[in-house]
Amino acid sequence: MVPPVQVSPLIKLGRYSALFLGMAYGAKRYNYLKPRAEEERRLAAEEKKKRDEQKRIERELAEAQEDTILK
């Protein structure tokens, strides 16, 4: 097995700095996008309720048209 290579402290500092900055950016971005996604999900749920209600009404009307006395 190959022995580990000595890495410059400056390179280590750069790597860990980039890691920390990436994590900080990700947390900030997540906090920015989370409320927007919640709003989109809420609107999608409202639209789904409206579509389901409309389909239910259409289905009831279709059944009422089929169930006439003059069959």
From Swiss-Prot:
Modified residues (N6-acetyllysine): K34
GO cellular component terms, semicolon-separated: mitochondrial inner membrane; mitochondrion; proton-transporting ATP synthase complex
Domain of life: Eukaryota
Family: Belongs to the ATPase e subunit family.
Keywords: Acetylation, ATP synthesis, CF(0), Hydrogen ion transport, Ion transport, Membrane, Mitochondrion, Mitochondrion inner membrane, Transport
Quaternary structure (record): Component of the ATP synthase complex composed at least of ATP5F1A/subunit alpha, ATP5F1B/subunit beta, ATP5MC1/subunit c (homooctomer), MT-ATP6/subunit a, MT-ATP8/subunit 8, ATP5ME/subunit e, ATP5MF/subunit f, ATP5MG/subunit g, ATP5MK/subunit k, ATP5MJ/subunit j, ATP5F1C/subunit gamma, ATP5F1D/subunit delta, ATP5F1E/subunit epsilon, ATP5PF/subunit F6, ATP5PB/subunit b, ATP5PD/subunit d, ATP5PO/subunit OSCP.
A single MF term (Gene Ontology): proton transmembrane transporter activity
InterPro entries hit by this protein: ATP_synth_F0_esu_mt
Organism, scientific name: Bos taurus (Bovine)
Protein's name in the database: ATP synthase F(0) complex subunit e, mitochondrial
Keyword Acetylation carried by entry: yes
GO-annotated biological processes: proton motive force-driven ATP synthesis
Function field: Subunit e, of the mitochondrial membrane ATP synthase complex (F(1)F(0) ATP synthase or Complex V) that produces ATP from ADP in the presence of a proton gradient across the membrane which is generated by electron transport complexes of the respiratory chain. ATP synthase complex consist of a soluble F(1) head domain - the catalytic core - and a membrane F(1) domain - the membrane proton channel. These two domains are linked by a central stalk rotating inside the F(1) region and a stationary peripheral stalk.
